[in-house]
UniProtKB/Swiss-Prot annotation:
Assembly and oligomerization: Forms oligomers.
GO cellular component: cytoplasm; nucleoid
Subcellular location: Cytoplasm, Nucleoid
Keywords annotated in UniProt: Cytoplasm, DNA-binding, Repeat, Transcription, Transcription regulation
Stated family: Belongs to the MraZ family.
InterPro entries linked: MraZ, MraZ_C, MraZ_dom, MraZ_N, MraZ_sf, SpoVT-AbrB_dom, SpoVT-AbrB_sf
A Gene Ontology biological process term: negative regulation of DNA-templated transcription initiation
Pfam family, one: MraZ
GO molecular function: DNA-binding transcription factor activity; transcription cis-regulatory region binding
Keyword Metal-binding: no
Record HAMAP family: MraZ
Name under which the protein is recorded: Transcriptional regulator MraZ
CDD domains: MraZ_C, MraZ_N
Length: 143
Protein backbone atom coordinates (compact mmCIF):
# COMPACT_ATOMS: atom_id res chain seq x y z
CA UNK A 1 0.00 0.00 0.00
CA UNK A 2 1.21 3.49 -0.84
CA UNK A 3 0.94 6.20 1.81
CA UNK A 4 2.71 9.34 2.85
CA UNK A 5 3.77 12.67 1.39
CA UNK A 6 7.28 13.33 0.08
CA UNK A 7 8.72 16.60 -1.22
CA UNK A 8 11.20 16.32 -4.09
CA UNK A 9 12.54 18.35 -6.99
CA UNK A 10 12.62 17.69 -10.71
CA UNK A 11 16.08 18.17 -12.18
CA UNK A 12 16.88 20.11 -15.35
CA UNK A 13 16.50 16.96 -17.45
CA UNK A 14 12.97 16.29 -16.16
CA UNK A 15 13.95 13.48 -13.79
CA UNK A 16 12.31 12.87 -10.45
CA UNK A 17 13.48 10.67 -7.59
CA UNK A 18 10.77 8.24 -6.52
CA UNK A 19 10.69 7.88 -2.72
CA UNK A 20 12.49 4.72 -1.58
CA UNK A 21 9.35 3.55 0.24
CA UNK A 22 7.46 3.45 -3.07
CA UNK A 23 10.12 1.89 -5.29
CA UNK A 24 9.77 -1.71 -4.19
CA UNK A 25 6.00 -1.77 -4.52
CA UNK A 26 6.05 0.05 -7.87
CA UNK A 27 8.64 -2.31 -9.28
CA UNK A 28 11.15 -1.47 -11.99
CA UNK A 29 8.45 -0.72 -14.59
CA UNK A 30 5.18 1.08 -13.98
CA UNK A 31 2.70 3.36 -15.74
CA UNK A 32 2.22 7.12 -15.34
CA UNK A 33 -0.82 8.89 -16.74
CA UNK A 34 -2.88 12.06 -16.46
CA UNK A 35 -4.75 11.96 -13.17
CA UNK A 36 -7.64 13.92 -11.80
CA UNK A 37 -7.22 17.33 -10.15
CA UNK A 38 -4.26 18.10 -12.45
CA UNK A 39 -1.89 15.62 -10.89
CA UNK A 40 -0.28 12.50 -12.33
CA UNK A 41 -1.33 8.97 -11.38
CA UNK A 42 1.37 6.30 -11.08
CA UNK A 43 0.33 2.63 -11.10
CA UNK A 44 2.38 -0.53 -10.61
CA UNK A 45 1.94 -2.83 -13.62
CA UNK A 46 -0.57 -5.03 -11.76
CA UNK A 47 -2.59 -2.01 -10.66
CA UNK A 48 -2.54 -0.67 -14.22
CA UNK A 49 -3.82 -4.00 -15.55
CA UNK A 50 -6.68 -3.90 -13.03
CA UNK A 51 -7.56 -0.32 -13.97
CA UNK A 52 -7.39 -1.19 -17.67
CA UNK A 53 -9.80 -4.09 -17.11
CA UNK A 54 -12.29 -1.83 -15.32
CA UNK A 55 -12.10 0.84 -18.01
CA UNK A 56 -12.54 -1.76 -20.76
CA UNK A 57 -15.89 -2.66 -19.25
CA UNK A 58 -17.25 0.87 -19.72
CA UNK A 59 -19.85 1.15 -22.49
CA UNK A 60 -18.10 2.56 -25.56
CA UNK A 61 -21.46 3.86 -26.80
CA UNK A 62 -21.46 6.54 -24.09
CA UNK A 63 -19.63 9.70 -25.09
CA UNK A 64 -18.51 10.47 -21.53
CA UNK A 65 -17.01 6.99 -21.11
CA UNK A 66 -15.19 7.27 -24.45
CA UNK A 67 -13.86 10.71 -23.55
CA UNK A 68 -12.57 9.58 -20.16
CA UNK A 69 -10.93 6.42 -21.49
CA UNK A 70 -9.39 8.30 -24.41
CA UNK A 71 -7.94 11.00 -22.14
CA UNK A 72 -6.71 8.50 -19.53
CA UNK A 73 -4.96 6.18 -21.99
CA UNK A 74 -3.62 8.84 -24.36
CA UNK A 75 -1.55 10.30 -21.55
CA UNK A 76 -0.26 6.96 -20.30
CA UNK A 77 3.37 5.97 -20.61
CA UNK A 78 5.37 3.06 -19.26
CA UNK A 79 8.30 4.24 -17.15
CA UNK A 80 11.35 2.60 -15.70
CA UNK A 81 13.50 3.54 -12.71
CA UNK A 82 17.15 4.29 -13.37
CA UNK A 83 19.91 3.12 -11.01
CA UNK A 84 19.45 6.19 -8.81
CA UNK A 85 15.71 5.55 -8.35
CA UNK A 86 14.70 8.32 -10.76
CA UNK A 87 12.18 8.47 -13.56
CA UNK A 88 12.14 10.71 -16.59
CA UNK A 89 8.79 12.50 -16.64
CA UNK A 90 7.64 13.10 -20.23
CA UNK A 91 7.18 16.76 -21.14
CA UNK A 92 3.48 16.37 -21.97
CA UNK A 93 2.77 14.96 -18.51
CA UNK A 94 4.85 17.64 -16.78
CA UNK A 95 2.89 20.25 -18.71
CA UNK A 96 -0.49 18.67 -17.89
CA UNK A 97 0.25 18.60 -14.14
CA UNK A 98 1.98 22.01 -14.25
CA UNK A 99 5.12 20.52 -12.74
CA UNK A 100 8.09 22.79 -12.43
CA UNK A 101 10.93 22.30 -9.98
CA UNK A 102 9.21 21.47 -6.69
CA UNK A 103 6.83 18.53 -6.53
CA UNK A 104 5.05 16.43 -3.95
CA UNK A 105 4.84 12.65 -4.33
CA UNK A 106 1.81 11.29 -2.48
CA UNK A 107 0.87 7.70 -1.66
CA UNK A 108 -2.85 7.07 -2.15
CA UNK A 109 -3.47 3.40 -1.27
CA UNK A 110 -3.18 1.62 -4.64
CA UNK A 111 -1.45 4.38 -6.60
CA UNK A 112 1.05 7.21 -6.28
CA UNK A 113 0.22 10.78 -7.26
CA UNK A 114 2.68 13.44 -8.40
CA UNK A 115 1.62 17.05 -7.77
CA UNK A 116 3.14 20.43 -8.32
CA UNK A 117 3.99 21.65 -4.82
CA UNK A 118 1.97 24.86 -5.17
CA UNK A 119 -1.07 22.99 -6.53
CA UNK A 120 -0.83 20.38 -3.74
CA UNK A 121 -0.70 23.09 -1.06
CA UNK A 122 -3.71 24.81 -2.62
CA UNK A 123 -5.60 21.50 -2.81
CA UNK A 124 -4.82 20.74 0.86
CA UNK A 125 -6.04 24.18 1.97
CA UNK A 126 -9.30 23.75 0.03
CA UNK A 127 -9.87 20.17 1.16
CA UNK A 128 -8.97 20.61 4.83
CA UNK A 129 -11.93 22.94 5.26
CA UNK A 130 -14.22 20.21 3.92
CA UNK A 131 -12.60 17.19 5.60
CA UNK A 132 -15.34 16.57 8.17
CA UNK A 133 -18.11 16.99 5.60
CA UNK A 134 -16.32 14.56 3.29
CA UNK A 135 -15.96 12.08 6.16
CA UNK A 136 -19.70 12.24 6.79
CA UNK A 137 -20.36 11.45 3.13
CA UNK A 138 -18.14 8.35 3.35
CA UNK A 139 -20.84 6.75 5.50
CA UNK A 140 -22.77 6.26 2.25
CA UNK A 141 -19.92 4.01 1.10
CA UNK A 142 -20.07 1.94 4.30
CA UNK A 143 -16.68 3.17 5.56
Amino acid sequence: MFMGEYHHTIDDKGRLIIPARFREELGVKFVITKGLDNCLFVYPMQGWAEMEQKLRSLPFTRADARAFVRFFFSGATECELDRQGRILLPGNLREYARLDKEVVVVGVSTRVEIWSRSRWEEYCRETSDQYEALAEKMVDFDI
